[in-house]
Swiss-Prot record:
Main location: cytoplasm
Name of the protein described by the UniProt record: tRNA-specific 2-thiouridylase MnmA
Recorded name of the encoding gene: mnmA
One annotated GO molecular function: tRNA binding
Role summary: Catalyzes the 2-thiolation of uridine at the wobble position (U34) of tRNA, leading to the formation of s(2)U34.
Naturally occurring in which organism (per UniProt): Frankia alni (strain DSM 45986 / CECT 9034 / ACN14a)
Highest classification ranks of the organism: Bacteria, Bacillati, Actinomycetota, Actinomycetes, Frankiales
Length: 352
């Protein structure tokens, strides 16, 4: 089989490519240049897609003895991921750029080009498992499981994907990398949004959206408690950094309950007002009909809650057995049956 190994410059993608070689496949490595002005070096776990990452990917390919190329997808990444990220925050939503990147870049732009060039599949270093029939499952390493950020992929995308690391823990992957002589064996994982290398999401958004001041309002009294520079700096469920001038009468902490970019108003209140029991999402990847009993996950590293899901036209309606807090429009909801991914979508509406 001819496979294209997406090599980020990290340990996971390097070992995934190595395992594809061991499996007897005809492997070609590719590094995705996703920034128009990449930084020279990474700063710990901050960011990725630097020139250092490209060099690390090339060195790994050389050790494996496979051809290596760099594909410039910076323009498409900016349009499909970065611009959408900015637009979402400007509209009061909370997007997950990793989910979006998988949908539009790795398993769309890259996969489409790979198939057009005669490759049979794309190999990545994601920690998830794929059954022979294309069923997506959680990784055996719960701490590193990435099935959530893959949960909105369509069956045809998963059908041409390969995830060789799904049956291994991260510790096993690092030991294997060291044994293979891969210099990235101890390279730190990237934890932050890859295109915001400094980690200051609020400041980064302010540069692109501009200051849009408005009031911070108490949900129960309607009292203005403070001012903000822009709703983009807030997410539903946020507690820190509110800079409120008036403590709550009962002394309890306040959380962001609602964000209204139209009026530039941020509404805050007690934790119990964050409780959500019903979600309406788009039907990004939901092939099932009727009511399906399942478990719902709404954050990349969050827990699951028992739920029922039902397709209604283009909508996916999810009713939760117990409420979850801090869930916002823009997040992905991924639905499971045990470790098996049933599908998912992007949340548009939440309700108590």
């Amino acid at each position: 089989m001819r496979v294209l190994a997406a090599m980020s410059g990290g340990v996971d993608s390097a070992v995934a490519a190595a395992r594809a070689v061991d499996a007897g496949h005809d492997v070609t490595g590719v590094h995705l240049a996703l920034s128009r002005s990449p930084e020279s070096d990474r700063t710990g776990a901050r960011g990725c897609c630097t020139l250092e990452d490209a060099r690390d990917a090339r060195r790994a390919a050389d050790v494996l003895g496979i051809p290596f190329y760099v594909w410039d997808l910076a323009e498409r990444f900016e349009t499909e991921v970065i611009d959408q990220f900015v637009e979402s925050y400007a509209a009061g939503r909370t997007p997950n750029p990793c989910v979006r990147c998988n949908e539009r870049i790795k398993f769309a732009a890259v996969l489409d080009r790979a198939l057009a060039l005669g490759f049979d599949a794309v190999v990545t270093g994601h920690h998830a498992r794929l059954d022979p029939d294309g069923t997506l499952r959680r990784s055996v390493d719960p701490a590193k499981d990435q099935s959530y950020v893959l949960g909105t992929l369509r069956p045809e995308q998963l059908g041409a994907a390969r995830f060789p690391l799904g049956d291994s823990t991260k510790a096993q992957v690092r030991r294997e990398a060291a044994a293979r002589g891969l210099a990235v064996a101890d390279k730190p994982d990237s934890h932050d949004i890859c295109f915001i290398s400094g980690g200051d999401t609020g400041g980064w958004l302010r540069e692109r959206i501009g200051s849009r001041p408005g009031p911070i309002v108490d949900s129960r009294t309607g009292q203005t408690l403070g001012e903000h520079d822009g709703t983009f700096a807030f997410t539903v469920g946020q507690r820190r950094g509110l800079r409120l001038g008036h403590p709550a009468p009962d002394g309890r902490p306040r959380y962001v309950l609602d964000i209204s970019p139209v009026t530039s108003t941020v509404t805050v209140g007690p934790a119990e007002e964050l409780d959500i029991r019903r979600l309406v999402a788009d039907r990004a990847a939901w092939p099932h009909e009727g009511v399906v009993t399942c478990q719902a996950q709404v954050r990349a590293h969050g827990g699951v809650v028992a739920a029922e899901a039902e397709a209604r036209g283009d909508d996916l309606v999810v009713t939760l057995d117990t409420p979850v807090r801090g869930t916002a429009a823009g997040q992905a909801v991924v639905l499971y049956d045990g470790d098996r991914v049933l599908g998912g979508g992007h949340i548009r509406v939440t309700a108590a």
